[in-house]
Swiss-Prot record:
CDD domains documented for this protein: GT_MraY
UniProt pathway: Cell wall biogenesis; peptidoglycan biosynthesis
Family to which this protein belongs: Belongs to the glycosyltransferase 4 family. MraY subfamily.
Pfam family, one: Glycos_transf_4
One GO biological process term: regulation of cell shape
Name assigned to this protein: Phospho-N-acetylmuramoyl-pentapeptide-transferase
Chief localisation class: membrane
Topology in membrane: Multi-pass membrane protein
Example GO molecular function: UDP-N-acetylmuramoyl-L-alanyl-D-glutamyl-meso-2,6-diaminopimelyl-D-alanyl-D-alanine:undecaprenyl-phosphate transferase activity
Length: 349
């Protein structure tokens, strides 16, 4: 173990969590300008391609020159912060590093294909899905080593229920594994869908990650809970720092590099805390965004007409004529409420 932080700074958990978030925030803001210049030199521009919602082509035409791939900024800041605040001698620290690298690598490759083709389509959905399954499977395989046993893997934290629900029988184990896969892959894709307006994904993720810090602090039965809290604190700082450049009007987009990274990390943290059911509450914005896309597809196939003017949900409101800033602010408020409900669900007695 290589201690990079004096022990007196770690005497108070809340203080050290706050410093972790501040470290990532400062790193993100400090590195933002050089990263943007580098992306511009590489010609990483966002190509607006909304073939099913023609009106959005016009609404987003001014965004065409904004550099994308800004998720690399989130990746660098998160990695640096975790290496500072987490002990190098623990398996879990390097697990988080590998996990971040996998999601950032997948998103970066997807962004590169989009830029090369100069359109809104990157990797084929089935290919991206297969890689996401592989990363999620890696997470589940690593969990027993992180926990030190398999027992926590067969438990679940249920909203508004004290303690943990144990499912040690074989059907319960299958359910736990399936739910974990859905949580990780679903959250990664849901945040990817949410990233469609300036500051939307970063802002809503800040509240969601903050909510899960409280979940981690209440998860005394989970061996890895404290390390997860540090990761989530770093995530909050990274998202707030990214808003410095991504807030309206955006100077930088996170691209799939950022959205797949943020979603995959949040989903993985929820699984590590055995809080997949709490994720549905705290991540209510992401559930609504992904749900709107699923319902839209089903409606088009079964009813031959759209349920929403355009999906995901934020584009529906944009299509109705609501200003982008108002939509983003209202989604932030909804995310704040969801985080509050999630915290209440954990504190309930």
């Amino acid at each position: 173990m290589i201690p990079l932080i004096p022990m007196f700074l770690k005497q108070s958990l809340f203080f050290s969590l706050a410093l972790t978030g501040m470290t990532t925030l400062v790193l993100t803001v400090s590195l933002g300008v050089p990263v943007m210049k580098w992306l511009k030199r590489k010609n990483y521009r966002d190509y607006i391609h909304k073939e099913y919602c023609e009106k959005l082509e016009m609404l987003h035409k001014d965004k065409a020159e904004v550099p994308t791939g800004g998720g690399v900024l989130l990746f660098i800041s998160l990695i640096a912060s975790l290496l500072v605040w987490l002990p190098w001698g623990k398996f879990s620290t390097w697990f988080f590093i590998i996990l971040l690298t996998c999601y950032a690598g997948l998103g970066w490759y997807d962004d590169r294909i989009k830029i090369k083709r100069k359109q809104g389509h990157g990797l084929k959905a089935k290919h991206k899905f297969m890689v996401q399954i592989a990363i999620a499977a890696f997470t589940l395989i690593a969990l027993p080593y992180i926990y030190g046993s398999t027992e926590p893997l067969w438990t679940l934290k249920i909203p508004f229920m004290e303690g943990m629900l144990s499912l040690p029988f074989w059907l319960g184990k299958v359910f736990c594994l399936g739910l974990a896969l859905v949580a990780i892959i679903g959250t990664s894709n849901a945040v990817n869908l949410t990233d469609g307006l300036d500051g939307l994904a970063a802002g809503t993720m800040s509240f969601a990650a903050l909510g899960f810090i409280f979940v981690a602090l209440r998860s005394s039965t989970i061996p890895i809970a404290q390390d997860v809290a540090y990761v989530l604190a770093a995530l909050v700082g990274a998202c707030i720092g990214f808003l410095w450049y991504n807030g309206f009007p955006a100077q930088l987009f996170m691209g799939d590099t950022g959205s797949l990274l943020l979603g995959g990390l949040l989903g993985s943290c929820a699984v590590m805390l055995r809080a997949e059911c709490i994720l549905v509450v705290i991540g209510g914005v992401f559930v609504a965004e992904a749900g709107s896309v699923i319902l839209q597809v089903l409606s088009c196939r079964l009813r031959k007409k759209r349920l929403f003017l355009c999906s995901p949900l934020h584009h529906h409101y944009e299509y109705q004529g609501l200003p982008e800033t108002k939509i983003v602010m209202r989604f932030w408020i909804f995310s704040f409420v969801c985080a509050g409900l999630g915290i209440a669900a954990v504190l309930w007695r």
